[in-house]
Amino acid sequence: MGALSDVIVLLGPELEPWRCARFEWEGDRLTRIERREPVLAIAAGARVVIPGLYNSHTHMGDSCLPDGATGLTLEEGFFRPHGFKYRMLAQLTREQHLPHVINHLRYMARTGTVGHLDFREQGPYGSELLREAALVTGVESVILGQFSGVPFDASALAANASRLPPAARAELEAILAVADGFSESTMNDLTDAAWGEIRELTERQGKLRAIHCLENAGYRDVSLGRTGRGDLVRALELYDPHLIVHLTVADPAEIALLAASGKTAALNPRANANLGLPVPPIRALMESGANLLLGTDNGLLNSPNMFAEMDYTYKLAKSQYGDAVRPDPLAILRMATCNIRGVLGPSHPGCLAEGLPATFVVLDFERPHLRSTRHIPASIVTRVTPEDVLATYRLGSPLYESEGFSARPS
């Protein structure tokens, strides 16, 4: 059993801050939350408990190459088969690679992240590597495996008729034996028939499907030129993904299509900006009613710090709204917490209440820049740093605890 006394807890899917006399858990469940009063501002510090954060789009395989693509375009740095990251990853042994991934998952826990959805390159080997790192650290890695190579040459892609070659089909089955689902870089990497095969196999096995869409205009333009349909349209029609990533250049019609589909989108504004791309239309996506998540994208581009991602997203959204009032900072915090249910289902509520998973983060609002906050949610989104994280728990077990932190009952 664990317990905290006299803490502020963001409760329920509304993430409403309450001063609580007791916050207790036993095993993997929250067992007692004794509320006192709702609270928005504090004058003399507190410990603040929030749901564990979910990083909904990562590539932790390339976390061993921080800032290695500086000065390179998206295509030069990240596209198969000759992009920088693929050339560098191919040179690493397992013994060289695994410690980097483990260290970055530990950094996630240090910064309040309990789980992530990872586009894992390098075929079955890549998925196995990340699975091992997750077991070592306790961070939940939802692994979305990718082919190790490019199954089709340019002529086959232009013809857009071929099914998966037998070797690619066998690799797909091997990936799904390890991973939680499948992902690809773009809809333009495979033929329509291949996407149909992947959808059929993943549906039969109950696996997740994810895809990058509209990261730049080229994604749409290549798809239109080859098939007469944009990449988002093809993704929804052929692949039926659970998660669509980026939407950086989505136009009003594409945003409406996403919202009508009921699909979840993961935004990655820091990565988009770092690549010199447009930032996503956050305001329009929020106003559409689509379920939105946040991710930090490639470890090569960004440290996987969700507090930094929330801060940047919130301020971009305010700029796009054009006033100092919108959006509510809680809407941004939900993108890193309870909105995860839209992809992972009711086993991952992303919020705190009695009977729900004991998956939470304890923040030190005794620190000088936090102790007299006038708006607790806004300060969580814009002011919390990794040094302010006292503890990160997943399913009742600590992933990280700062020196001197104690959660023993008293």
What are these regions (language model features)?
Residues 166, 176-300:
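Active-site core of metal-dependent hydrolases
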Residues 64-99, 138, 152-160, 207, ...:
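Active-site gating loops and adjacent loop-to-helix segments of metal-dependent hydrolytic enzymes
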Residues 107, 115-179, 184-185, 192-197, ...:
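Mid-domain alpha/beta scaffold segments of enzyme catalytic cores
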